[in-house]
From Swiss-Prot:
The lineage of its organism: Eukaryota, Metazoa, Chordata, Craniata, Vertebrata. The gene is PAPOLG. Coiled coil: none annotated. Residues 509-519, 539-555 have a biased composition (Polar residues). This is Poly(A) polymerase gamma. Mg(2+) 2 binds at D112, D114, D166. Gene3D superfamilies: 1.10.1410.10, Beta Polymerase, domain 2, Poly(A) polymerase predicted RNA binding domain.
Length: 736
């Protein structure tokens, strides 16, 4: 019996080695204390509504069953209308697949369902958005039905018996769709258009993730905890440059592969251990990328120069492999890595019995964290316009973050994913206002008593991008405005209610009081390390910008309240020369010369001449010698400035096979920049399996990032029609 038991254990261990691209770090089974900590983790998560009860789960199944029947009926009707033989119509089939958090089994109460409608080859996409849309319109229980055909992944959105559903469409090059269809088969992608491939990709990635984890239930519980933590800490948003649900799932799946037998409480701790020490931009891979003869574009930095600029690559496991985190910027990566380290310190305390899981789920003190903030405001005159406008502005905020990162004097631009309702007293002409806050860290300049910083171009190129996109999709309407204002921490009470600021401050002090040696971070004090006083000027400058219609009336000029902190509105012509190396044009035409002034507070000084007394912006790559910026400190900037690289480095050799090798604990993969491969090799003597095959990547901490494929703004035509839009000029002086 003992021999059989030993053989069983050995067989189990051999099987576990097939998960992931390296051997596991530990095969240790959980102890009793691990199960106790796991139960405590579950108890800590329950108040946040992350678990659905049986009744709610069954209701979702009923709704999906109804939707599946509707799809089959519709496909049958379409088949008849296209004169297919009755024998074919009877067996044509059709099916609904789910993906995303629901398919992974980690959806929360009230969450929507991502679903895919799969149809046979004779059903067109136009049928889906026309006849099926009409069928849904007349179906009982359907509410808020809307189609988004021009989206990156075209979708129909609706509520069905109280459940929100996002339904995408794909037709396969086969005559019938059986109930046991396996979408993981790569051959299903043959002869499909790109929109169908994108639609199928969600299901294929989700299913592949579930096939690549050793224990699905442990994976699900761990992922629930990590997703809740990420949302609570303000780093859950693919749109804003953090990570979305699929990316978090892949990071947790990789952790499960490395510790295949661990309990969820242990895996949460190991998650922070692994990714607080991960050497980005080495990619996270769940399996070796597979080649295919379908010749679809895949993520490969050896072949695609743009892939070398990705800062935090997490590669989807299903063909065609893609980087799910191409929106990540230098700032968002810095914030996330800091959060990984903080999470590791907290879970260390929890597993030592010094703290409990509720501490891990405490929100951050964002409004006490920084000395300087930029308030971004989006407003519209009607609720319907506001919903559209806010969605577009939010989707482009990462453009603003990128612009600010390229500013010579900015170390970090941290956007808070949560938006807030705006103060209507500041926007009397628009009743619908939303605000976002960006925490800013400015660089310390050596041997300078004061620094004059001009953020005008960074803001204007961002607003031009948004207005151009709105015009291109015929969204831009009278009353839609964007404004940006620089404020200091002590002035935030002009924008946010006291309970929000006080609550955050209280939590911050509580964190400090309860922190032990293991929780002391490397952050410097804001009050001691930043340049102290600042003087800034916000100039609202109206000028012509694109409109969707030639007869559109002019938008009224926004007048700021004189009580607004450190904000000075000077509505006058402003000529801002474009910064070197940026391709986004500033749209402008005839400028209204009307001038309105408001006396500034005594602490403010307005530069008398635009461009004078302002240190010119020179974009530079990040200097590794300066180290990572502390999230609430100031880093030094040297006098010697190196221009940004304007082209991708050449590749002398191209390895033939992707290979990822991780070290024990350090977990370094071999997707290395060739220039540092030897250095890293000397650091490592305990590599796990496989030989090193360097693939060039580029750490673009302070280098020029290539534009996202979603943002073809610089190449968009400049419209001839104009609508006058308020623009902000932001200049400030930082003193020691």
């Amino acid at each position: 019996m003992k021999e059989m038991s030993a053989n069983t254990v050995l067989d189990s261990q051999r099987q576990q080695k097939h998960y992931g691209i390296t051997s596991p770090i530990s095969l240790a089974s959980p102890k009793e204390i691990d199960h106790i900590y796991t139960q405590k983790l579950i108890d800590a998560m329950k108040p946040f509504g992350v678990f659905e009860d049986e009744e709610e789960l069954n209701h979702r199944l009923v709704v999906l069953g109804k939707l599946n029947n509707l799809v089959k009926e519709w496909i049958s009707d379409v088949s008849e209308s296209k004169n297919l033989p009755p024998s074919v119509v009877a067996t044509v089939g059709g099916k609904i697949f789910t993906f995303g958090s629901y398919r992974l089994g980690v959806h929360t109460k009230g969450a929507d369902i991502d679903a895919l409608c799969v149809a046979p080859r004779h059903v067109e996409r136009s049928d889906f958005f026309q006849s099926f849309f009409e069928k849904l319109k007349h179906q009982d229980g359907i509410r808020n039905l809307r189609a988004v055909e021009d989206a990156f992944v075209p979708v129909i959105k609706f509520e069905f018996d109280g459940i929100e559903i996002d339904l995408v469409f794909a037709r396969l090059a086969i005559q019938t769709i059986s109930d046991n269809l396996d979408l993981r088969d790569d051959s299903r992608l043959r002869s499909l258009d790109i929109r169908c491939i994108r639609s199928l990709n969600g299901c294929r990635v989700t299913d592949e993730i579930l096939h690549l984890v050793p224990n699905k239930e442990t994976f699900r519980l761990t992922l629930r905890a990590v997703k809740l933590w990420a949302k609570r800490r303000g780093i859950y948003s693919n749109m804003l440059g953090f990570l979305g649900g699929v990316s978090w799932a892949m990071l947790v799946a990789r952790t499960c592969q490395l510790y295949p037998n661990a309990a969820a409480s242990t895996l949460v701790h190991k998650f922070f251990l692994v990714f607080s020490k991960w050497e980005w931009p080495n990619p996270v891979l769940l399996k070796q990328p597979e080649e295919s003869n379908l010749n679809l574009p895949v993520w490969d930095p050896r072949v695609n120069p743009s892939d070398r600029y990705h800062l935090m690559p997490i590669i989807t496991p299903a063909y065609p492999q893609q980087n799910s985190t191409y929106n990540v910027s230098t700032s968002t990566r810095t914030v996330m890595v800091e959060e990984f380290k903080q999470g590791l310190a907290v879970t260390d305390e929890i597993l030592q019995g010094k703290s409990d899981w509720s501490k891990l789920l405490e929100p951050p003190n964002f409004f006490q964290k920084y000395r300087h903030y930029i308030v971004l405001t989006a407003s519209a005159s009607t609720e319907e316009n506001h919903l559209e406008w806010v969605g577009l502005v939010e989707s482009k905020i990462r453009v603003l973050v990128g612009n600010l990162e390229r500013n010579e004097f900015i170390t970090l631009a941290h956007v808070n994913p949560q938006s807030f309702p705006g103060n209507k007293e500041h926007h009397k002409d628009n009743n619908y206002v939303s605000m976002w806050f960006l925490g800013i860290i400015f660089r310390r300049v050596e041997n300078a008593e004061s620094v004059n910083i001009d953020l005008t171009y960074d803001i204007q190129s961002f607003t031009d991008t948004v207005y151009r996109q709105a015009n291109n999709i015929n969204m831009l309407k009278e009353g839609m405005k964007i404004e940006a204002t620089h404020v200091k921490k002590k002035q935030l009470h002009h924008y946010l209610p006291a309970e929000i600021l006080q609550k955050k401050k209280k939590q911050s002090l509580s964190d400090v009081n309860r922190s032990s040696g293991g929780l002391q971070s490397k952050r410097l004090s804001l009050d001691s390390s930043c340049l102290d006083s600042s003087r800034d000027t916000d100039n609202g400058t109206p000028f012509n910008s694109p409109a969707s219609k030639s007869d559109s009336p002019s938008v009224g000029e926004t007048e700021r309240n004189s009580a607004e902190p450190a904000a000075v509105i000077v509505e006058k012509p402003l000529s801002v020369p474009p910064a070197q190396g940026l391709s986004i044009p500033v749209i402008g035409a005839k400028v209204d010369s009307t001038v309105k002034t408001v006396s500034p507070p005594t602490v403010c000084t307005i530069p008398t001449v635009v461009g004078r007394n302002v240190i010119p912006r020179i974009t530079t790559p990040h200097n590794p010698a300066q180290g990572q910026p502390h999230l609430n400190g100031m880093s030094n900037i040297t006098k010697t400035v190196t221009p940004k690289r304007s082209h991708s480095p050449s590749i002398d050799g191209t390895p033939k096979r992707l290979k990822d090798v991780e070290k024990f604990i350090r977990l370094e993969s071999t997707f290395k920049d060739p220039r540092t491969a030897e250095e890293r090799k000397r650091k490592s003597v305990d590599a796990i399996g496989g030989e090193s095959m360097p693939i060039p990547t580029i750490d673009t901490s302070r280098k020029k990032r290539l534009p996202s494929k979603e943002l073809p703004d610089s190449s968009s035509p400049v419209p001839a029609n104009n609508i006058r839009v308020i623009k902000n000029s932001i200049r400030l002086t930082l003193n020691r």
